[in-house]
From Swiss-Prot:
Function as written in the Swiss-Prot or TrEMBL entry: Specifically methylates the uridine in position 2552 of 23S rRNA at the 2'-O position of the ribose in the fully assembled 50S ribosomal subunit.
Catalytic activity: uridine(2552) in 23S rRNA + S-adenosyl-L-methionine = 2'-O-methyluridine(2552) in 23S rRNA + S-adenosyl-L-homocysteine + H(+)
Gene it is expressed from: rlmE
Compartments (UniProt record): Cytoplasm
GO cellular component, one term: cytoplasm
InterPro entries according to UniProt: RNA_methyltr_RlmE (IPR050082), RNA_MeTrfase_FtsJ_dom (IPR002877), rRNA-MeTfrase_E (IPR015507), SAM-dependent_MTases_sf (IPR029063)
Entries under Pfam families matching the protein: FtsJ
Protein name: Ribosomal RNA large subunit methyltransferase E
HAMAP family reported in the protein's UniProt record: RNA_methyltr_E
Family statement drawn from the similarity comment of this UniProt entry: Belongs to the class I-like SAM-binding methyltransferase superfamily. RNA methyltransferase RlmE family.
Amino acid sequence: MSDDDQKPEDATPDGSEPAENQPDGETPAAGEGAPDQAGLPGWGSSDKRRGRRSGPMKKGGDARAAKQMFERVKTARGRKSSSTRWLQRQLNDPYVKKAQMEGYRSRAAYKLLQLDERFKLLKPGMRVVDLGSAPGGWVQVALKSGASEVVGIDLLEMEAIAGATLLEKDFTDADAPSLVKAEMGGAADAVVSDLAPWTTGHKTTDHLRIVALAELAAHFAVETLKPGGFFIAKVFQGGSDSDLLNFLKANFEKVRHFKPDASRSESAETFVVAMGFKG
C-alpha cells in the first residue's frame, strides 16, 4: 500500500470524502496514529475506517469567498492536529480532485502516468504486477494502457477491478513469484511498486525502511520478470540506497531516478526506474 493512501486513524473529512479511499494521506509521526515498530513495519497495514462529519457553516458572502479561496477543516474535539492537516491538504489537492473526476481510486495513479510519460514504459499486451496495490490506482493505469494481464498484490483486501487479478497476500512469501506467474500465464513484463512503510518522522529511519522495502520488491522483480522487462519502486532520498542501486545495475541495462510532478513537493519520495532486465 502506498503512503499516498495512508491517513491518520482519527481523520474523517467534513463533507464528501475522497473517492479513492482517502488517498495520499499524511503518514503520522509515531504516537500520532502510525505503528511505532522496530525494523520494517507491515507494508500493507492500514485502518480502513471511514466516516463523515458535518459542522456548522457560516453564512454570507465573506464565508463563501473564503471557501472558494481555500477549503479549511475545523479541528474537532478528539481529532489530532495531524489529522486536521491531512484533511485540509486532501480538500485542496488538485490531484485528489482530478482522481475523483477521472475515476481513479488514488491520486497516486498520476505518478505512474507521469513515470510512463517520461520513460515510455507501458505498452499494450504487457503483463504487469503491482506490489502493494491497494486501493488500485496503479492497477487502473496498467489496465488503461492496454495490459493483457494485471496482478495486484496487497495485504489488504481490495474491491474488485474488472480485468485484474487481485491477491490478498504478502509479496515476500516464498511462493509469491510462482503464484503470480501462474496467474498471468508466464513471466511479467513489468513489476511496479508504490509501497511505503509507516513513517516515524525520523528521516534516516524512514529512508532505511523504505530502501529495505524496495530491495525486497527488487528481488521479487528479478524472480518474476522476463528479459527486457522493467521495475519501478519508490524510495526516499537519503543516500543509503547504494546496495539497492548496485543490485539493480547488475540485473538491468539502465537505472534512473525520477520524481513525478504528482509527488508532493515537500515529500522526500522519488522513484527508481530499472529498464532492460538482463534475465
